[in-house]
């Protein structure tokens, strides 16, 4: 049954409900929130509705009695062969043969548009994802957010949303100062100045690479003695490793130490400090953009945190005017507990500096000021405590907090078979997204990142992702697509071609249970996309593609698509030609849906493997 026919079936039930309301069997204000679902067991029909069960309380009657009244009130429809009442009151609908094949017509008529809808046409949604600090290359954890955010964005577009993908560039604040100072200290080292590098500095080799570029460009123009930079700076943290292998602090304060180095670097360099900050920022941000672009992840907007500096004070003034700010211990606090948060939050410190939370309030107000109907934030699971305070701020500003959806994405662990891969080291090295992509390929990375619910940890098996077996779901799904392509190549090599008209005429030959199951599953694709998109659950689509590939492989292995006579150079009989064209039609439909689904997930659909 096509999506249009599903809508027709829903309309038939609405008509029956109208009759019951008119007869006084149901209250006039009763709202129909029932569901029409595809059955898994063919003996239960093609579709089932729970409408009688949902209406029973309002009708003050047994669900089966309500079901009988609904069935009796249903208008006739040529696509329906039979209707049964089952169990406690489910209404099972059996379609006639012609109606079952309507989905194949839809697939070939709509092509890449099959399954897409305009249900949310005209609504604007912003999806913000990754938004990693531009202080280092992206690691494998960021990769999951990238794959998830891009897939969700594609799915939302598939159901009609006008989607803006956004990366929030955290280019302001203390982390950028730590990066700038780390770069400057490495620059001193490249110029021969001995440096005691801070524990809290950025340790990676990429910082030294940026520093080397700056030396090439500016020689020793900005060199100062390290003693000047470290003057009056609190002692850095000193650690030892105890008998249990744990790092134990002996003395010093790494935070105070790096802050002192930052302050002295700014004072000594003056305007030159911005040179180091901007050089590091532009280099790392360019690397991030290249990495994501190579991963098939793109954005309509790269939004700079610096750009909202001027919006922070006005938004705090709004909160103050509304009575939601107060002073305590020199800090300015936001009354987030008034809106369900566990405690109030500081928005301006005693030293006059606004907090990161204050920037986030301004940023989220800015999002809705830009006219988005809905905003989706894809955050790491470690941000779970941050959600209530952001929603509290929106409520305080008079913005409907339900317009903000936050999806928390859990962490990723890498495995090689039974051995867990170390994700990082003390030297500052970590497994990057680029390294993962180069080892397993973009397709495997994109698929396995979204193949599980976002709130579930991902155990990424590197060896499995590279294997060519049915256990590797990416290979298994793509191989189904390639198999159809191979059949068409063999057909062409034999001097024959696909006859779409004959395939449509003969499709009623597809009566095997496996063929009926395939057609039924193809018909489920539009509803699958809708559910996957509205719930921000791309794993629903990966599961669907896995099921479709499995059904196809099983059918393919048990049924010949091309007649045996072709391999011996004989001309197929009329019956063989009829069955061949019918099965080619079904195969091409499967190929098209797999290609469409893989495309929404950002994966390729290879013609050979």
Curated annotation (Swiss-Prot):
Q: What class of enzyme is it?
A: ligase
Q: Report the locations given in the UniProt record.
A: Cytoplasm
Keyword vocabulary terms for this entry: Aminoacyl-tRNA synthetase, ATP-binding, Cytoplasm, Ligase, Nucleotide-binding, Protein biosynthesis
Q: Which cysteines are joined by disulfide bonds?
A: none
Q: Where is this motif: 'HIGH' region?
A: 132-142
Which Gene Ontology terms cover its molecular function? Answer: arginine-tRNA ligase activity; ATP binding
Q: Which reaction does it catalyse?
A: tRNA(Arg) + L-arginine + ATP = L-arginyl-tRNA(Arg) + AMP + diphosphate
Has UniProt tagged this entry with the keyword Aminoacyl-tRNA synthetase? Answer: yes
Q: Which GO terms describe its biological process?
A: arginyl-tRNA aminoacylation
Per the record, its GO cellular-component terms are: cytoplasm
Which Pfam families is this protein grouped with?
Arg_tRNA_synt_N (PF03485), DALR_1 (PF05746), tRNA-synt_1d (PF00750)
EC code: 6.1.1.19
Q: What is its main location?
A: cytoplasm
- What NCBIfam families does this protein map onto? argS (TIGR00456)
| Family, per entry | Belongs to the class-I aminoacyl-tRNA synthetase family.
Known partners and oligomeric status: Monomer.
Q: Per its record, how is this protein called by name?
A: Arginine--tRNA ligase
Q: Which gene encodes it?
A: argS
